[in-house]
A protein has these predicted regions:
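Fungal eukaryote-biased detector of long internal structured cores
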Residues: 1-2, 15, 200, 270-280
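Cysteine-centric segments in proteins
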Residues: 218-220
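Conserved short alpha-helix immediately C-terminal to the canonical SAM/SAH-binding motif I
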Residues: 186, 238-241
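Conserved N-terminal entry element of GNAT/NAT acetyltransferase domains
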Residues: 1-32
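Conserved active-site tyrosine of GNAT-family acetyltransferases
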Residues: 41, 242-243, 247
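Conserved hydrophobic beta-strand within the GNAT/NAT acetyltransferase core sheet
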Residues: 168, 230-234
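Conserved acyl-donor/pantetheine-binding loop and adjacent beta-alpha core of acyl/acetyltransferases
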Residues: 29, 40, 44-68, 75-180, ...
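C-terminal "cap" of GNAT-fold acetyltransferases
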Residues: 237-239, 248, 255-280
Length: 280
C-alpha cells in the first residue's frame, strides 16, 4: 500500500440519490468522492454490521462535509503464462488504482434532539414515532435536512441544550486496512480542519433571516455560532478509540440503540479563538 491521501467533499445536494440502490446505478450528478465514501460505508456498515442498505444514506448526508482516504493498490490483472520451454506466451499485467479505504463525515448544526436514553432507533426514527412527521422518508433528502429548526434540547453533561455543535460520524475503515491508524488520520484531519475553519457552518445574518433571529433571541443565544463543541454518537464497542482522540462520554446523555447497536454520546471542545458574526 502506498502513502494514503485524503479527499475533501463540501456539502452537496446529492439530488436523485437512490437509497439502497447499487452505486453503479446512482445518477451521474453524484460526486465520485461521495460514491467512494458510500463504498466504504456499505462495506463496513451494511455488509459487516448488517445495517439495511436503504438506511445507510440519510438526510444529513447532503448537508455534511465528507472525507475519504485512499490508498494506491496494485492489482494483477493478467497472470504470466509460459510455454513448456519457458518462453513467455502472455506477460504479467498489473494496474494501480486509488482505492477508497476509509471515510468520515461532519454534520453541521442544527441537529435533531438528543436521542432518548434507552430508545431504539431505526433509520433515525425512534420506535413508535411517526417517521413522516419530520419529512424523513425515502424522498428528497436535501429538502428534509435543510428544514431542521434550531431548537432547545435537553441538557446533558457537556451540552447546555442550546449551544450549536457539530457532529462527527460514519467513521469507517475497510477491514484489511485496520490497525494502520487510518481512523486516527481521518479524525485528526477533521479536527484540524475545524480549527482552521471555525466559521464554516456559521450562518450569516442574511442567511439566518430576521424571523429566525427573533425566535432565537427568546433564548440566551443570538446568531448561532459554533464555539468549538464537537459531538460523536459512538458505538459502545469503540468508545475507547474515541477517548484516544480527546472525546469524553456524556453520562447524562445515556445509552440508546441505532440499527440494533448500542451507542453513547461523547463530546470534546476545541480551542478556536475569537470569531465575528458573518453579515453576507
Amino acid at each position: 500500500m502506498g502513502t494514503p491521501f485524503i479527499t475533501f467533499l463540501a456539502p452537496s445536494k446529492l439530488d436523485g440519490y437512490k437509497r439502497g440502490a447499487p452505486l453503479d446505478e446512482q445518477p451521474p450528478n453524484i460526486s465520485q468522492t461521495f460514491l467512494d465514501a458510500m463504498e466504504v460505508r456499505e462495506e463496513v456498515f451494511v455488509k459487516e454490521q448488517k445495517v439495511p442498505a436503504e438506511n445507510e444514506f440519510d438526510d444529513d448526508d447532503p448537508r455534511s462535509c465528507h472525507w475519504v482516504v485512499y490508498a494506491s493498490i496494485n492489482k494483477v490483472d493478467t497472470l504470466e503464462i509460459r510455454d513448456e520451454e519457458g518462453n513467455i506466451m502472455q506477460p504479467r499485467k498489473s494496474s494501480t488504482r486509488s482505492t477508497p479505504i476509509g471515510t468520515i463525515r461532519l454534520v453541521p448544526f442544527p441537529h435533531d434532539p438528543h436521542p432518548e436514553n434507552g430508545g431504539k432507533y431505526w433509520n433515525g426514527v425512534l420506535e413508535g414515532e411517526d417517521k413522516h412527521k419530520n419529512g424523513e422518508e425515502n424522498g428528497d433528502a436535501s429538502k428534509a435536512s435543510s428544514d431542521k429548526p434550531f431548537i432547545m434540547d435537553r441538557k446533558t453533561t457537556f451540552h447546555n441544550g442550546q449551544e450549536p455543535y457539530v457532529k462527527l460520524g460514519r467513521l469507517a475503515v475497510i477491514e484489511e486496512f485496520r490497525g494502520r491508524r487510518i481512523a486516527g488520520l481521518l479524525v485528526t484531519t477533521v479536527l484540524g480542519w475545524l480549527r482552521d475553519n471555525p466559521s464554516y457552518f456559521d450562518p450569516s445574518i442574511k442567511e439566518f433571516g430576521l424571523g429566525q433571529l427573533d425566535q432565537v433571541m427568546g433564548t440566551d443565544m443570538k446568531i448561532p455560532q459554533w464555539a468549538g463543541l464537537v459531538c460523536v454518537h459512538a458505538q459502545a464497542q469503540v468508545v475507547e478509540f474515541w477517548k484516544k482522540w480527546g472525546f469524553e462520554v456524556d453520562e447524562e446523555m445515556g445509552t440508546w440503540w441505532e440499527e440494533g447497536m448500542p451507542h453513547v454520546g461523547m463530546f470534546q471542545r476545541l480551542e478556536i479563538g475569537e470569531k465575528t458574526v458573518r453579515l453576507d
